[in-house]
């Protein structure tokens, strides 16, 4: 697993090891011990999945304390250009954004 820090604190791009063969592939997308060692909170309590048709634009998501939650975003079919905007007042990167291509092909995940 490779973890790349972005210019926005708390946002990482994760590339898991993917083992491909004639049958398909296998990838470990989450391992609490490995995530914790990489500085990623390892106490996920909810797992969601959504399907977006081609051309769909999903809006910005934001949670205020005490309802904040981390997100681990991955794509299982197709691709998305995942954009994260820092709207945290007082953050040194307030107003800046970072983006990553997440796809079934590259198997990258975004931890927000």
Regions found by a protein language model. Give the residues of each.
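Short tryptophan-centered beta-strand motifs in secreted/extracellular beta-sheet-rich domains
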Residues: 110-112
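Non-catalytic, conserved peripheral segments adjacent to functional cores
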Residues: 1-106
């Amino acid at each position: 697993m490779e973890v790349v820090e972005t210019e926005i604190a708390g946002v990482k791009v994760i590339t898991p090891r993917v083992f491909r063969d004639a049958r398909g592939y296998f990838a470990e997308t989450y391992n609490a011990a490995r995530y914790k060692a990489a500085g990623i909170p390892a106490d996920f309590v909810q797992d969601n999945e959504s399907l977006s048709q081609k051309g769909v634009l999903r809006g910005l998501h934001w949670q205020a304390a005490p309802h904040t939650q981390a997100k681990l975003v991955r794509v299982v079919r197709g691709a998305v250009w995942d954009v994260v905007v820092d709207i945290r007042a007082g953050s040194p990167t307030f107003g800046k954004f970072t983006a990553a291509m997440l796809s079934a092909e590259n198997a990258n995940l975004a931890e927000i």
